[in-house]
């Protein structure tokens, strides 16, 4: 009788199935890590933008002199956010002593996250879909077309 060596087809399919399960789990973990990293980057960017605006325009009585190109150039920052959209600065039309940081180009999920996030130093908390947050925004547009507005100032 001959001695055969090697693996059977069943054993190979079992190994491939196990590898598939491991791969799916790894992809899920990587996706979560990337989403968390992008959200942290946006938080850090907004803090840098707000600090820059306050340092550059703090001597004025209002923020009516806000200019996106000047502000982003002075703080050495690109207006592009990690989601492929942009950051924008505008004076609050209802109160020139306040300015609004806009985060454009968000998915519905990320928009909802940023609307309900408690933004430090933002003006009040806005009620949005039953959740308290320091920002406003409609998160019903298609992916990549949602915008969040965060108001800062007095």
Enumerate the predicted regions with their spans.
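N-terminal alpha-helical signal peptides/signal-anchor transmembrane segments
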Residues: 30-33, 43-64
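Periplasmic/extracellular, small/polar-rich flexible segments of pilin-like filament-forming proteins
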Residues: 55-154
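Short, well-structured alpha-helical interface segments that form or flank functional binding sites
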Residues: 41-44, 109
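N-terminal single-pass transmembrane signal-anchor helix
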Residues: 1-34, 42
